[in-house]
């Protein structure tokens, strides 16, 4: 590209961004297009910064070449990020949601060797971690009539000695290290699947951002579950000997102890073992799995008097089958408080990858799809698909390794279409996560379905940003229409991405600011004049 063409391309990118922001300050334009009011707040300067970065890239017109730092450097980088953020956030805000319950279970296990929390609640042990009040979360009673916690005992068991040694901050440090290790495992899976160092690095960066970044310093089962799942899958796909196959079985068998919703994922890993392991490693895998399953059943029988893995809930909970799968899918993707894409837009590339031959022809695609569907299936029919009062995308954290590996298959191909946005999407999600965590006292990471989303309020201008994102906790037809608008925009981008692979003029649309600005304008118009009318 000649210097004059570079200059025109750079100026065009700046013009699109500056033009949109400039229109927002014209009263007549805002009256006609109310959504422009969102640019009269912090998002206006954000758009200008993005436009400036795109203009600089068009002016320089140099391909971005990033080498593979290797697993140890990636682990150290991830650990420093998670530890620094976790220490800052944990020091500035007490626990909430399910966190005090997991910590109280850990305290009871270490100090008293049991999970009878009646005395812990009587002493208000939760005051060590939160001002409360904290109401008990009890499931089905034990066979002797005593109450038993509704939460799975796996995470409290793992955290009990850590909590005894250093309290909540030590637990945060342990989860931060687990998150860093998870991202390295994802990097290895991506290298195996895509075979390109740049693709592996992108997969690591996607995994290290939200939502894993959120749960790397919250006391929930999501990061340990994702790590156990990803590590077990990586071992099974690596042609292991009997010893490593047994370790894969141990990791897969740990999933039900962390949360009962992970039982289908554990079963799927067993199917992957059957597909990939020869006789001796397969025997070692199932020897461990059988022993762990027997232990799980014995635990249920000893406590509840039944062998059912769902004994904690007294059988299959009504909430597990009363949800709407369609609303859950839309919510998991687009919900303004609990969705994935508003906080981690890089996973748009994973959705695009699923529609391409590159992923379906990649190594182990069937095994990865099997495990991914097993993770997703219990969530789709769960009434509380959003996970309660918690950071965004809670129940999708165990799916992040598979989403990251999927987008890496696309990153291994020539950079065209949506892949031109890969690093801006990574940067946008990570910057938003850091903004949300920087001021713990403002509670921007803690969401509930019955109130506005704090982070979008903080980023609003004259018009609320939250107006243009759906809230799908309740089955509101208006919110469903807003979600449909975003679903249509997503499908359009994926279609254009497929066309960009073969057609240079379409690919050129992804190189500047025109396509994203026009798409956001279209979404705003549809929300204002159709979805919310």
Question: What are these regions, as identified by a protein language model?
Answer:
Residues 1-90, 191, 280-288, 424, ...:
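Start-transfer (signal-anchor) and selected internal transmembrane alpha helices
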Residues 111-165, 313-321, 383, 452:
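Interfacial juxtamembrane loops and adjacent helix segments
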Residues 170-194, 227, 231:
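Transmembrane-helix motifs of polytopic, lipid-linked glycan transferases
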Residues 194, 232-247, 358:
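Membrane-interface transmembrane helices that cradle and orient dolichyl/undecaprenyl
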Residues 199-210, 230-234, 248-256, 270:
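Short helix- or helix-capping micro-motifs
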Residues 217-224, 339, 392:
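Short acidic/glycine- and proline-prone juxtamembrane loop motifs at membrane-interface regions
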Residues 237-238, 264-290, 294, 349-363, ...:
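Perimembrane helix-loop-helix junctions
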Residues 280-353, 368-381, 400, 428-450:
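Membrane-lumen/periplasm interface segments of specific transmembrane helices
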């Amino acid at each position: 590209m000649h210097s004059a063409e570079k200059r025109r391309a750079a100026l065009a990118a700046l013009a699109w961004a500056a033009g949109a922001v400039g229109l927002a300050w014209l009263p007549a334009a805002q009256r006609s297009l109310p959504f422009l009011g969102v640019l009269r707040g912090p998002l206006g300067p954000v758009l200008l910064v993005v436009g400036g970065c795109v203009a600089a890239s068009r002016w320089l017109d140099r391909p971005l070449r990033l080498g593979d730092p290797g697993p140890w450097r990636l682990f150290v980088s991830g650990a420093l990020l998670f530890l620094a953020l976790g220490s800052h956030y944990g020091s500035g805000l007490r626990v909430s949601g399910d966190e005090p319950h997991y910590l109280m279970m850990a305290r009871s296990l270490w100090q008293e060797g049991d999970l009878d929390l009646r005395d812990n609640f009587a002493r208000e042990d939760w005051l060590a971690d939160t001002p409360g009040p904290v109401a008990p979360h009890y499931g089905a009673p034990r066979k002797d009539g005593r109450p038993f916690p509704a939460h799975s005992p796996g995470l409290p068991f793992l955290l009990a000695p850590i909590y005894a040694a250093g309290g909540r901050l030590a637990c945060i440090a342990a989860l931060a290290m687990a998150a860093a290790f998870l991202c390295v495992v994802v990097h290895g899976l991506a290298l195996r699947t895509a075979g390109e160092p740049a693709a592996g690095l992108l997969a690591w960066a996607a995994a290290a951002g939200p939502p894993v970044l959120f749960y790397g310093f919250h006391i929930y089962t999501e990061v340990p579950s994702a790590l156990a799942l990803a590590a077990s899958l990586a071992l099974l796909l690596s042609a292991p000997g009997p010893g490593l196959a047994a370790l894969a079985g141990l990791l897969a068998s740990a999933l039900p102890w962390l949360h009962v919703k992970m039982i289908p994922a554990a079963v799927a890993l067993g199917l992957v073992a059957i597909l990939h392991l020869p006789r001796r490693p397969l025997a070692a895998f199932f020897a461990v799995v059988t022993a762990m399953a027997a232990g799980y059943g014995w635990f249920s029988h000893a406590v509840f008097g039944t062998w059912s893995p769902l004994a904690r809930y007294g059988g299959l909970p009504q909430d597990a089958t009363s949800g709407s799968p369609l609303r859950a899918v839309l919510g998991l993707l687009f919900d303004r408080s609990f969705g994935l894409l508003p906080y981690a837009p890089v996973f748009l590339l994973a959705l695009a990858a699923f529609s391409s031959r590159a992923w379906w022809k990649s190594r182990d695609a069937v095994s990865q799809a099997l495990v991914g569907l097993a993770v997703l299936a219990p969530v789709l029919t769960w009434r509380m698909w959003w996970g309660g009062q918690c950071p965004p995308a809670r129940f999708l954290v165990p799916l992040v390794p598979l989403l990251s590996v999927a987008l890496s298959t696309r990153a291994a191909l020539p950079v065209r279409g949506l892949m031109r946005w890969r690093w801006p999407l990574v940067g946008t999600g990570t910057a938003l996560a850091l903004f949300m965590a920087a001021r713990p006292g403002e509670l921007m990471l803690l969401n509930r379905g019955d109130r506005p989303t704090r982070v979008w309020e903080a980023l609003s201008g004259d018009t609320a940003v939250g107006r243009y994102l759906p809230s799908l906790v309740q089955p509101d037809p208006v919110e469903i229409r807003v979600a449909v608008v975003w679903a249509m925009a997503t499908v359009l981008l994926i279609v254009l991405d497929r066309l960009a692979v073969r057609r240079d003029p379409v690919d050129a649309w992804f190189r500047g600011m025109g396509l994203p600005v026009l798409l956001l304008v279209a979404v705003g118009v549809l929300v204002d004049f159709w979805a919310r009318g």
